[in-house]
Amino acid sequence: MNVFNRDIDREPTRAEAERALALLRDWAGAASDGEIETLDPALSALCPGRAVSDYPTLSRTYPDGFEADAAYKASLPDLQNGPASLIRGARRQIQHVGISNFRLPIRFHTRENGDLTLETSVTGTVSLEAEKKGINMSRIMRSFYAHAERTFSFQVIEAALASYKADLESFDARIMMCFSFPMKMRSLRSGLDGFQYYDFALELVETAGVPLKIMHLDYVYSSTCPCSLELSEHARRERGQLATPHSQRSVARISVALEPGGDCLWFEDLIDLCRKAVPTETQVMVKREDEQAFAELNAANPIFVEDAARLFAEALLTDPRIGDFRVVASHQESLHSHDAVSVLTEGATFAADSLDPKLFSTLVHGR
């Protein structure tokens, strides 16, 4: 009987080494990568076709009990706060860098003194100096969440912006909050109520310490072409021919800068201004008598896209809480295969020599 003794007091011969090597190769040839790594990763060199790695063997089991203490956190690399030598590309100031479309429930106050909790998409950005590599974007979210339990107003948005601007040591900053605001709307004749949803955005921009508060609203309405209406009436009158004018769903994006120190412009107030300017808002609850009333309402208010821009402007100019503004209107034609569009700006805030190439394509109903 042969007994293996670990304490061999002589050097193995070459023949013994060759036999041992052959045995290891036979075993390694049938073993898995995991089995080889468990025994000794260096054995990969003995197997034809297996890659040899000098990388240490790492655990593949998630460490549930591991806790990162202060010392460990301090040891973590932070490339975004690295030296200027890490900057890639031109060393230029970046006007806006941050995060977009992080969502959370936010509580908003209504004109009737109630609160609504609405899903809100938040964009937060700051300026970045030319000599800084980058920002820690999670700080924007953390700063915003610190205020998320409060009922939001522009004052709360200002506090959130100040928090992350200080945390990121930036000069300029911006917050935009997008949400759909529900408001009850009564039908034209049947007396039924339904919820109309309005896409709003609140924007706070601070540049060189000066805040600018902006409210955006997408208002959806029906536009009946005045020319088509007259042509239809001509066919009826002159030839006894039944004809109908073309009308279409239309969207106006109303952007208003709020006057500093002015009274609160409620969401409902801006909606009311739009309804006053263009009363042919699309309906929610509709019975036959409402549909007939809507046809009559459109006939009483035919409107070109140029008219729409000017009518909205006329209403906005009457409100002392509103400073500069912009109206972007899109009549999504039922006659033509293209849309009719217009842009009207008042004041320097929204004046621009160039338009976003995708601007008009974003004027759609719903999200």
Where does each model-flagged region fall?
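N-terminal intrinsically disordered, cationic/polar leader segments
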Residues: 2-367
